[in-house]
């Protein structure tokens, strides 16, 4: 009998267990495609970023000009930059859908996998933030100034911390240089953590829409789910190409076409769209330190979700009351995203404050209490 090399070779064996002979539940839906799509996004971002880094100059006098040079003079530089900028947006769309899937189907009960995922989200946000500073446009400069300034809210060490991150007394050349270094380094850290994320996932196996044990009904990952993922790849590449070729500046800010000027403040300082929900929560609290803590907690609250699971069922597919509040949470997050892009005036301030309270209430009180109520209703039958 011929020896199958993929099952015996030390390197190929790892790939085989992860991508070919991996036992997968037979009933996982399209919602389980986003993990592989995130892997594709990461590869696209690393490759396009590498080519951009070859032509970019991390100096405040040349950064803006070097981006212009990439778009005008480098072969297909405009395309690489558009793919990289819009690829980030698609990355975050996939991340948020991936998290929503995890919340809906109870995937967060794989605690190690879930918590590493939350750390990955935090690193992804940090990477996107430092990357947004690199073109050195108006919004890059002022965004960096405002967000890094938030660290001054921490007692005693705040001002020292801000100056340490800036490398001086204002956002300057030292800041840009270190942000470029971080932006180059962090994606590789994300890549390493992704491998650990997968390692923990493959220890338990994937969850499924029913939220029940699927050991009795599993099929191999290849060819079934490899081809299913391939369809997702084509759809995502088509969307990315459409965005990058037809409306490359749709999700960007017009202010960033103006070179950074420390003497002129833009009328509305706001981050990229994928940070607006957290930015709205930050702005809705009048106290600076309170706002910073709420901003951090808006992401790290996801780590509390496994601890707040009170239901006897894993998935919320059979829990209509919790389903209602889950969709409230989705709508609430969309409202926060909209509020984050609006000026700081009434009625936006009030709506933002109500949406912020709702966001934390749904996670900490309403959904756990609803699950507990559903348990009581089930026990009555």
Curated annotation (Swiss-Prot):
Comment on bound cofactor: Binds 2 heme b groups non-covalently.
Subcellular location: Mitochondrion inner membrane
Record-linked Pfam families: Cytochrom_B_C, Cytochrome_B
Transmembrane segments annotated in the record for this chain: 34-54, 78-99, 114-134, 179-199, 227-247, 289-309, 321-341, 348-368
Extent of the signal sequence: none
UniProt keyword terms in alphabetical order: Electron transport, Heme, Iron, Membrane, Metal-binding, Mitochondrion, Mitochondrion inner membrane, Respiratory chain, Transmembrane, Transmembrane helix, Transport, Ubiquinone
GO biological process: mitochondrial electron transport, ubiquinol to cytochrome c
Protein residues bound to heme b b566: 98, 197
Cofactor(s) the record lists: heme b
One GO location term (cellular component): mitochondrial inner membrane
Database matches in CDD domains: cytochrome_b_C, Cytochrome_b_N
Binding site for a ubiquinone: 202
Mode of membrane association: Multi-pass membrane protein
Any one Gene Ontology molecular-function term assigned to this protein's record: ubiquinol-cytochrome-c reductase activity
Function, as annotated: Component of the ubiquinol-cytochrome c reductase complex (complex III or cytochrome b-c1 complex) that is part of the mitochondrial respiratory chain. The b-c1 complex mediates electron transfer from ubiquinol to cytochrome c. Contributes to the generation of a proton gradient across the mitochondrial membrane that is then used for ATP synthesis.
Family according to the record: Belongs to the cytochrome b family.
Subunit (UniProt): The cytochrome bc1 complex contains 3 respiratory subunits (MT-CYB, CYC1 and UQCRFS1), 2 core proteins (UQCRC1 and UQCRC2) and probably 6 low-molecular weight proteins.
Other comments on record: Heme 1 (or BL or b562) is low-potential and absorbs at about 562 nm, and heme 2 (or BH or b566) is high-potential and absorbs at about 566 nm.
Name of the molecule in the record: Cytochrome b
Source organism (scientific name): Negaprion brevirostris
């Amino acid at each position: 009998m011929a020896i199958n090399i993929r099952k015996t070779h030390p390197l190929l064996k790892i790939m085989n267990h992860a991508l070919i002979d991996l036992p997968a539940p037979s009933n996982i839906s399209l919602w389980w495609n986003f993990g592989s799509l995130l892997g594709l996004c990461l590869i696209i971002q690393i490759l396009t970023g590498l080519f951009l880094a070859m032509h970019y100059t991390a100096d405040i006098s040349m950064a803006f000009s070097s981006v212009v040079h990439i778009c005008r003079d480098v072969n297909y530089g405009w395309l690489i930059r558009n793919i990289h900028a819009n690829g980030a947006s698609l990355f975050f769309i996939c991340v948020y859908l991936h998290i929503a899937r995890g919340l809906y189907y109870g995937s967060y009960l794989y605690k190690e996998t879930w918590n590493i995922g939350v750390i990955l989200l935090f690193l992804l946000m940090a990477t996107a933030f430092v990357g947004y500073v690199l073109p050195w446009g108006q919004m890059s400069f002022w965004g960096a100034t405002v967000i890094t300034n938030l660290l001054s809210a921490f007692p005693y060490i705040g001002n020292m911390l801000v100056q340490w991150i800036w490398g001086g007394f204002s956002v300057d050349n030292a800041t840009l240089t270190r942000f470029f270094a971080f932006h180059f380094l962090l994606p590789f850290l994300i890549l390493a953590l992704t491998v650990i994320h997968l390692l923990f996932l493959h220890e338990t196996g994937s969850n499924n829409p029913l939220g029940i044990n699927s050991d009795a009904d599993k099929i191999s990952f290849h060819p079934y789910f490899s081809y299913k993922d391939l369809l997702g790849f084509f759809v995502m590449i088509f969307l990315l190409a459409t965005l990058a070729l037809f409306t490359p500046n749709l999700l960007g800010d017009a202010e960033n076409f103006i070179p950074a000027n420390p003497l002129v403040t833009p009328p509305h300082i706001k981050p990229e769209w994928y940070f607006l929900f957290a930015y709205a929560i930050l702005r809705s609290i009048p106290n600076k330190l309170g706002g910073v803590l709420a901003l951090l907690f808006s992401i790290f609250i996801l780590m509390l979700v496994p601890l707040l699971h009170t239901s006897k069922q894993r998935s919320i597919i059979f829990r209509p009351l919790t389903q209602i509040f889950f969709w409230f949470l989705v709508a609430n997050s969309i409202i926060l995203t909209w509020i984050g892009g609006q000026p700081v005036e009434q009625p936006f301030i009030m709506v933002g404050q109500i949406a912020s309270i709702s966001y934390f209430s749904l996670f900490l009180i309403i959904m756990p209490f609803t699950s507990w109520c559903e348990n009581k209703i089930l026990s009555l039958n």
